[in-house]
Amino acid sequence: MAAADGGGPGGASVGTEEDGGGVGHRTVYLFDRREKESELGDRPLQVGERSDYAGFRACVCQTLGISPEEKFVITTTSRKEITCDNFDETVKDGVTLYLLQSVNQLLLTATKERIDFLPHYDTLVKSGMYEYYASEGQNPLPFALAELIDNSLSATSRNIGVRRIQIKLLFDETQGKPAVAVIDNGRGMTSKQLNNWAVYRLSKFTRQGDFESDHSGYVRPVPVPRSLNSDISYFGVGGKQAVFFVGQSARMISKPADSQDVHELVLSKEDFEKKEKNKEAIYSGYIRNRKPSDSVHITNDDERFLHHLIIEEKEKDSFTAVVITGVQPEHIQYLKNYFHLWTRQLAHIYHYYIHGPKGNEIRTSKEVEPFNNIDIEISMFEKGKVPKIVNLREIQDDMQTLYVNTAADSFEFKAHVEGDGVVEGIIRYHPFLYDRETYPDDPCFPSKLKDEDDEDDCFILEKAARGKRPIFECFWNGRLIPYTSVEDFDWCTPPKKRGLAPIECYNRISGALFTNDKFQVSTNKLTFMDLELKLKDKNTLFTRILNGQEQRMKIDREFALWLKDCHEKYDKQIKFTLFKGVITRPDLPSKKQGPWATYAAIEWDGKIYKAGQLVKTIKTLPLFYGSIVRFFLYGDHDGEVYATGGEVQIAMEPQALYDEVRTVPIAKLDRTVAEKAVKKYVEDEMARLPDRLSVTWPEGDELLPNEVRPAGTPIGALRIEILNKKGEAMQKLPGTSHGGSKKLLVELKVILHSSSGNKEIISHISQHGGKWPYWFKKMENIQKLGNYTLKLQVVLNESNADTYAGRPLPSKAIKFSVKEGKPEKFSFGLLDLPFRVGVPFNIPLEFQDEFGHTSQLVTDIQPVLEASGLSLHYEEITKGPNCVIRGVTAKGPVNSCQGKNYNLKVTLPGLKEDSQILKIRLLPGHPRRLKVKPDSEILVIENGTAFPFQVEVLDESDNITAQPKLIVHCKFSGAPNLPVYVVDCSSSGTSILTGSAIQVQNIKKDQTLKARIEIPSCKDVAPVEKTIKLLPSSHVARLQIFSVEGQKAIQIKHQDEVNWIAGDIMHNLIFQMYDEGEREINITSALAEKIKVNWTPEINKEHLLQGLLPDVQVPTSVKDMRYCQVSFQDDHVSLESAFTVRPLPDEPKHLKCEMKGGKTVQMGQELQGEVVIIITDQYGNQIQAFSPSSLSSLSIAGVGLDSSNLKTTFQENTQSISVRGIKFIPGPPGNKDLCFTWREFSDFIRVQLISGPPAKLLLIDWPELKESIPVINGRDLQNPIIVQLCDQWDNPAPVQHVKISLTKASNLKLMPSNQQHKTDEKGRANLGVFSVFAPRGEHTLQVKAIYNKSIIEGPIIKLMILPDPEKPVRLNVKYDKDASFLAGGLFTDFMISVISEDDSIIKNINPARISMKMWKLSTSGNRPPANAETFSCNKIKDNDKEDGCFYFRDKVIPNKVGTYCIQFGFMMDKTNILNSEQVIVEVLPNQPVKLVPKIKPPTPAVSNVRSVASRTLVRDLHLSITDDYDNHTGIDLVGTIIATIKGSNEEDTDTPLFIGKVRTLEFPFVNGSAEIMSLVLAESSPGRDSTEYFIVFEPRLPLLSRTLEPYILPFMFYNDVKKQQQMAALTKEKDQLSQSIVMYKSLFEASQQLLNEMKCQVEEARLKEAQLRNELKIHNIDIPTTQQVPHIEALLKRKLSEQEELKKKPRRSCTLPNYTKGSGDVLGKIAHLAQIEDDRAAMVISWHLASDMDCVVTLTTDAARRIYDETQGRQQVLPLDSIYKKTLPDWKRSLPHFRNGKLYFKPIGDPVFARDLLTFPDNVEHCETVFGMLLGDTIILDNLDAANHYRKEVVKITHCPTLLTRDGDRIRSNGKFGGLQNKAPPMDKLRGMVFGAPVPKQCLILGEQIDLLQQYRSAVCKLDSVNKDLNSQLEYLRTPDMRKKKQELDEHEKNLKLIEEKLGMTPIRKCNDSLRHSPKVETTDCPVPPKRMRREATRQNRIITKTDV
């Protein structure tokens, strides 16, 4: 093809003569594509090795006939322009070049580019034939297609948008032969890259030099989750292998981005074979370069489909298409027939590329994720069929999707292998749900069998969920490697012994491993090379991933805990509830009869099934319908339990038809059927049984339901039929199976319902009667009133039972009522008394029928009323239940108010008994009129007298009547203020009406009055009026007073005012009296006695007879008016006449000033009130002496008076001068005197000048407010908060009751709680000392006051809250978590530390406060029980480096296996304990030691007779291996048990033989136990009579290196049967006695050991008490021998008080806020790291280090950098790991004036290293490093002179460091001093940035004493407690009960000795006790037993009780 399309022959050449005529030439092929008419072929051109671009271009122009001036470009096929710079590296031999008008010009016609690829075509073509092979029945074709998808994923990895990959199966014969096309929208390939693709095994890592590649300069992608980096096109073989596996020809079509050309390459087996046959270059070919959508070169009909594919290129910017033709027929069939299978396989391979790192999770909302852009679509086109199109994202049944969606939880981990090898792993848990495993089955390769119908008596055993499938599928760079899987790892394989989770849980996990490219895979990507080997290498590190973070931990324990958690959370089993008991089921085979637990309910998948519930079965023949009776669960269960399997017992329904019970597996219950459907089936079956009754009334008189009938009404005859549900009549029960001859009867009953119960009054039974089925006659005897029920009941013929098969037979009940009949007679009801004349009343009537039942009147009747002497009539009579004759009125005379008796006859015409007599008593009626005496109309009386009236109240028949509240009034008119007469006539109806005297004022002549007499309560009674003539009275009526002046008398009227000079006397007062007729009355002695005056107690009677009154003294004050009164009083009148004396002022005498509005004036303000100035007389009475002109004469003077605002005004209304605007110049508060002067008068007043109104709040005795005050969380503030109200001039404002409050943030808590305070009388409020609780950091407080509804804000207090380094918050427990805990051994060491709030370890803690508790874990909870074992910590060893840690060493592990809980506690105080997290340990059995029986058999007694029973030694003997503590162990041991008979003497050869005449027998030992069913002697076996022999059971276990102690069973041998029986009884008694003796001895030994331990404890407590007492004596503290605890308590209280006072004393402190310690790597600010006791030294050193005081010291640079970042670089930091420590000073070095240990000169000023004055509360070593670097060898002396002298001397011998003086001077190390920069300011100028002072030494001494006293108190209490326990134990041992037990032991030992003698057991046997009993622990006489022994004794004493003995 190249020759055909080539240019002219030979071609041109370019070069120089030195090129040697072709040697070293390069041949290039040139296509001229400038114009469309250009030649189609290429022109070969020879280029010399040394040619340049200019020569080459000239040659091109010459060859193609182009003018050199013409513009054109020469490019490569990749459109790379050839220039001078790239000519040599681009123009290579064989290269194809374009001649274009521009680089971006379209190819007007296609070109062909020669390419070479190295391998033989057979290597290429057949590479795919054998690389893809089938494994486990899988077709490899999907894996070959996956190779092409790999290439597409790599090509699209850089796509920003959708990464689209299409696989098109073109199987439509009308479009050509079958083909497979894989198309992607990746970056495409240039022609050179396409050439590279054709080169076999050209890996991306080896493409360099001549090979241009999209992977040139390969760089590994950055790590991403699951290694989903699309870097999976790897080796240069996959695509070609896949192509030639699928078909025999491949067409590669590709267009790179930003390229104008499409490159096309065809490789085919046919073409290769043709070239080989023609001896052509078989590994060369052509790449066709063309424009997009150009398909003119497709001429073969077999490839017609390519036209459509090429047309689609127009819309694509870049793409690559692989078109495979010549597809193998078997592949075509597979692709067609198994479309879903292989697309599902591809979805599995690329699951995580399609769905992302988390897989195909079921998401509730569609989230946009970076992996949603991969779109792999597969389509298959067939002739005449709708195309099949599937997107791999839509496939939901690939295995990974099934794994993801059926998993309940996941466990993620990571493995690091050989450096960069990383494997991410995930394990998913598929729980068991009720009756099935949820582990997904592969739909294509199902491993589970279909459900088969099981027999009812079979047990369904659920097999493992995963089956034999491995756990892990393996993914490489995110894609599946299908033929490699990993079975498991050591840490996730099922354990040999039961672990935390059941074994079956290990079969419920699936997993996936995701490796990066550091693991080798085969070139076909089917298998890993060595993944499993590397992962299972011992150096592989597994870590767990939690919340995306990698955590180093024990992967096996973490996995076990996770699996246990999954099992507990997600595994769901059937819950059996309502436990009823355990039974055996004899209906089952013998091995399955029991035990069976029975339950009344189960809970299955949220649904509850209970006994009695209707259910239906499935998979049973026939299907069962019935009700649940109970549930069965195999096993000895007790209470509620979760389990699988189980059976349900069903009572077949309806029971009337199916009287049987069936039992089926619970799994066969139909959970889908509704209970309604079951109920309907039962009802349909029940339709055959009698259902209802049909009742008719052939003769009438029908009884209707709920009918009400009159008494005596008959009930008609009844006709009855029995019907079933189908409406069919029946007379007997259906079906022969139910005893079909059973007839049915109908029973009739009439029942009366009464309050006393139901009473049966009629009862009949009817049989079926042929024509009339069932019949009952008419009933006429029902007369009683009440509710009735007529009941018809179907009953059985023989038994009269009304139920059948537990179901009631049909019945019918008709309820009716019987009421009364029509009325026949009557009687009177209860009447309303009394009866009054003219007052209507009612007569109630009661009617009865003929049976005496109460009836009602329903007809019209006119009653007749008659009574002698009375007039009677009525209004009406009412009908109905309450019949009443209404409105009966009687009129006539009665004798008195008590009334009169009458007989009233009532007649009702029409009744059988029509009349009745009613006796009544008639009382007088209501009042109707008044009768008044005297009868005269005009009455005459004198004024001032009373008048009586006689009144009577009468009714309408003129009878005197009475009633309640019958009150008669008499009202007078004609004058004011007349009295009212009242009289009560309620009882008698008559009385005398009178009252007070009639008094009319100022009556001068006769006057006429009117009197009206009436009854207010009786409006119907007319009033009576009388006329009264009133005459004037002759008694005293008026009194007058006169003042006589000369001969003239002036009347002083009543209430007159008399003006008189103040202090004077009024003389000559007289009086006169007159009657009502104005007649003067002469004063007699009797009248004079009745005259009184109020101004003097003594009256001259002689003067009164003359009409003279006593003199009146006038008051001295004009304000004090005098009230004078003259009064007269007798029996008729009371008179008075009064006047007021008003004093008048005298002459002017004084000037008086008066303050109004208070005498205090606030500073800066005017006096609120005014000063009023007046002129007074001698008595102080004001005189009107001022006028407006008087103001000029007034002067005001005072010290500090501000006269600028003084205002004086004349007050005309008060005749005074007002002075306002008094103000003082601000100054010290106090009293101010003011002098007021007017003319010759003057006066002084004193004013108090006080502070101004509150304007400020100041803090008293508080540090600087600008800096934050450091406070440790939970501690007190340094000072109390005291605030003072001040005015604006800072004068204290003494305003009390002003509310003071603190404002703060909600997260800042103060104790005591923030309450409102009020200021005291000084204006000061003490808020007290607060304890502060807040999160660490800066917080603010502000004091505010509320004054006059306005807020006065005080200063803001800044608090820097620091964590409390002394407050314990948790316990840190460290121990070896990999250690195993064997019973009876020793625990690993536990290291406990108490962690404070700042995450540091709290040190100096009394070890006695740390304890360890251990108890056995139970189901009741994790709280420690009361009897939990408690341990104390061990003493600190020398090699214990960590300070503040406590160690629990060598603590004994419990003897019994099980799960134990350990918890450590720190006693914070007497009541609060800080507990650690609980440590759960599993105690395992110890080493196997001995062979023991499960149940110790009795000592056998046998003989050698024929009877097997007499020769049987052992039956059902179970032997197992235990450790020293009787824990069963050795479960994994396998071997044999050798049974041998031995005698007491080794020489004894005449020993019995086993059956078979053998001396030894072997028994298998499996799973830690051996079962010996029976052991029988041989018949006529040798042996001596009455001799004891031994059976030695010796274990032989090959896997166990040590020898175990055998089990030895003694037995007695006899030759005589009878003797054997006797001896057997004795042997049994001997065994009982032996057991009893052992129990008694155990009790006594345990009691004695407990006693010894108590003595030991007493001794230890006594020694401890003595030791502490001696230590207290060293501190001069003596403790008395009596009343020790009260004395210690008092001492402690006093010492604590002293210590608290010392701590509260103010001492120097650093107020610089400390930096919050975020971690243990932060030490704090330098100012807080050290303390200095001396104030002067502290001042100068703090100043010297002023620039460093704020620096935060950290241990690491990382921590420093973190603080730097947090503060944006504002905080200076100092990391200790950056300090060069070799230059640090030696803290032990002597001062410079010492040379070689000798004094060089005598210094002055007490020199000392500055660093030696520092004390460090914490972190001493780190602090020495810091201050050693900062201070170096700085020396401090007393003063500057001493420092200068010291320096002068030191420099003579060595370098002199910086010198500081206690006076604050500094001499630098260079000798410079002086100036402000070398002089320390005063302490208060350092702004709190000063080193604090340490706690006083006395405080530390007190702390030691307090600690000792507390320990001594505990020791005294402990000694007292153990003494009491010892005494109690001694008393217990002396009790009669213990003595009795001792006697019983002695008797048992005697009896045992006698029995042994009878048995013939000689003392020789006792030497062989070692054969049967393990050696006992030796005890010594030491009262203190070993620790282990004491513990054992204590435990045994706990266990052994009296009942055991």
Swiss-Prot record:
The modification N-acetylalanine is found at A2. Changing P690S: In FSHD2; decreased protein level in fibroblasts as compared to wild-type protein; decreased ATPase activity. Residues 111-702 are annotated as: ATPase activity domain. It is an enzyme of class 3 (hydrolase). Atypical member of the structural maintenance of chromosomes (SMC) protein family. Like other members of the SMC family, has ATPase activity, which is probably necessary for its engagement with chromatin, and a SMC hinge domain. However, the SMC hinge domain adopts an unconventional homodimeric arrangement augmented by an intermolecular coiled coil formed between the two monomers. Changing E136D: In BAMS; no change in protein abundance. Keywords: Acetylation, Chromatin regulator, Chromosome, Disease variant, DNA damage, DNA repair, DNA-binding, Hydrolase, Hypogonadotropic hypogonadism, Isopeptide bond, Kallmann syndrome, Microphthalmia, Phosphoprotein, Ubl conjugation. Sumoylated with SUMO1. Changing K518E: In BAMS; increased ATPase activity. Belongs to the SMC family. Highly divergent. This is Structural maintenance of chromosomes flexible hinge domain-containing protein 1. The gene is SMCHD1.
